[in-house]
Swiss-Prot record:
The keyword Transferase belongs to this UniProt entry's keyword annotation: yes
Lineage: Eukaryota, Fungi, Dikarya, Ascomycota, Pezizomycotina
Pathway(s): Secondary metabolite biosynthesis
Family as reported in the entry's similarity comment: Belongs to the tryptophan dimethylallyltransferase family.
E.C. no: 2.5.1.-
Organism: Neosartorya fischeri (strain ATCC 1020 / DSM 3700 / CBS 544.65 / FGSC A1164 / JCM 1740 / NRRL 181 / WB 181)
Protein name: Prenyltransferase nscD
S-S pairs: none
């Protein structure tokens, strides 16, 4: 019998982290085997999740709870295991930074009053995924959400179901269905260490390009009025719309199309509107983060933000803040510099939206390890090392061998940066490398690879 089918006796190895995972291993010995596909995804992503929670210091009972949820609610949605380095269906998870796998991860490093915590991003796959019967992969997602309504008592999908018909296109014409085929909905699964709840986020993406330009002006306001009532306060949304329309820096922002929604009580939920810019000067980034000065940030915070941006890009401290990040003219491919992403966090009860920046590791760092060391060193220097940010390196080494982390980019997708109480709140987004490292993953899961540290 193949090791992939033998639960508890061949659980595979990690590429570079030989430390045991006692809770994961105990569950592997006790849980039902399931299908060969489920075993593949459980052995790979279950181990990753177990490593993340162990390194982040999750209580043992919470580790068990989250692993069981992952095994029985999430893993069965991943569909067939890979048969080659080319995905049978290319998921939109992690967008341009992903390799087509239906899952990615994030690690929030934590702030003075909040511990590190983990989130997974998934796209459920089903028998109709990628076929003419389900060109936008709606069926599997709807089935997954229906299943969650019987499992998660805190789940409230009312805002999502209100927004969904405004943002997800339906096509009656065959030519249009084929033209606009592709995923339109993703799911975020948030696993907080200090809660017994599992929180769900939904991300909607219109397939018709013309819709993207209408999001702020028409589509989102209409959906918000339907959700909250005709008298809903749209001050936060209108502020963002005015900045993008009238401010010189705002006019450089392009909507990306993604709209994020918290699946909790409507009055507590947020609507996240994503944009991007090709301008890499720090002055521009700071202006976008402050919404043209309407959401002021202290000099200390801006200095920290500039320090992090310069270090990730390898810039000297006296590099002019008005200048764009230099691009190696002879350099081709994904490592060239192409700007920064942001989202504006819109809530009817708040007049000012929160802002978060997204820095693409493949475009703004020499290697995955260099980026991680830069972020960790920054946190330690600025008194944010109380949650042991270096534990994140153990997570990366459980996914990718050390020499690949030192010489390549690809394991990490983004770092996001927000401001919380004068601290930079940083989150790392990374991917399991299911297809990009297809051959190595097959060997590792069959337990034939020695540790890279041996």
């Amino acid at each position: 019998m193949s090791p992939l089918q033998l639960n508890g006796k061949s659980r595979g190895t990690s590429p570079g982290n030989a430390e045991p995972l006692p809770i994961f291993d105990a569950l592997c010995r006790s849980l039902p085997v399931g299908t060969a596909d489920e075993q593949f995804w459980w052995k790979l992503t279950g181990r990753h999740l177990a490593r993340m929670m162990l390194e982040a210091g999750y209580p043992e009972h919470r580790q068990v709870e989250c692993l069981l949820f992952h095994r029985f609610k999430v893993v069965p949605t991943f569909g067939p295991q890979p048969q080659s380095a080319e995905p049978w269906y290319r998921s939109r998870v992690a967008a341009s930074a992903g390799d087509g796998a239906p899952i990615s991860y994030s690690w929030r490093f934590g702030t003075a009053d909040r511990k590190p915590y983990i989130r997974n991003y998934i796209e459920p796959l089903g028998p109709l995924t990628g076929t003419a019967a389900d060109p936008n992969n709606d069926v599997a997602t709807r089935a997954f959400l229906q299943d969650l309504t019987t499992t998660l008592p805190n789940l409230d999908l009312s805002l999502f179901w209100t927004f969904e018909p405004h943002l997800v296109s339906r096509f009656s014409d065959k030519a249009d269905r084929e033209k606009y085929a592709g995923p339109s909905v993703l799911t975020g699964v948030e696993l907080s260490p200090d809660s017994d709840a599992i929180e769900i986020k939904m991300y909607l993406y219109p397939r018709i390009p013309e819709q993207i330009s209408q999001l702020l002006s028409t589509i989102i306001p209409k959906a918000m009025r339907e959700a909250y009532g005709d008298d809903v306060c749209l001050d936060s949304l209108n502020l963002v719309k005015d900045f993008l329309s009238n401010h010189p820096d705002g006019r450089q922002l392009s909507p990306r199309g993604t709209t994020g929604i918290d699946c909790c009580k409507v009055q507590d939920s947020r609507v996240k509107f994503y944009v991007a810019t090709n301008n890499t000067s720090f002055d521009h980034i700071a202006t976008v983060m402050t919404i043209g000065g309407r959401r002021p940030l202290s000099t200390e915070v801006l200095d920290k933000l500039r320090e992090l941006w310069y270090e990730l890009n390898g810039l000297p401290s006296d590099f002019p803040t008005s200048e764009q990040v230099p691009t190696d003219q002879g350099q081709e491919g994904p490592s060239g510099h192409h700007g920064v992403g942001f989202y504006y966090d819109i809530q009817p009860r708040l007049a000012l939206p929160d802002v978060k920046a997204f820095i693409n590791v493949r475009k703004h760092a020499k290697s995955d390890l260099a980026a991680a060391e830069t972020v960790i060193g920054f946190l330690e220097r600025h008194g944010q090392g109380h949650h042991n940010p270096r534990a994140y390196l153990n997570v990366l080494r459980d996914i990718v061998p050390a020499e690949e982390l030192e010489t390549r980019v690809g394991a990490q997708a983004f770092y996001s940066v927000a401001v919380k109480k004068e601290e930079l709140d940083i989150t790392a987004y990374f991917i399991p490398q299911v297809y990009r490292r297809f051959a190595s993953v097959q060997v590792e899961l069959n337990g034939q690879r020695r540790s890279r540290f041996e």
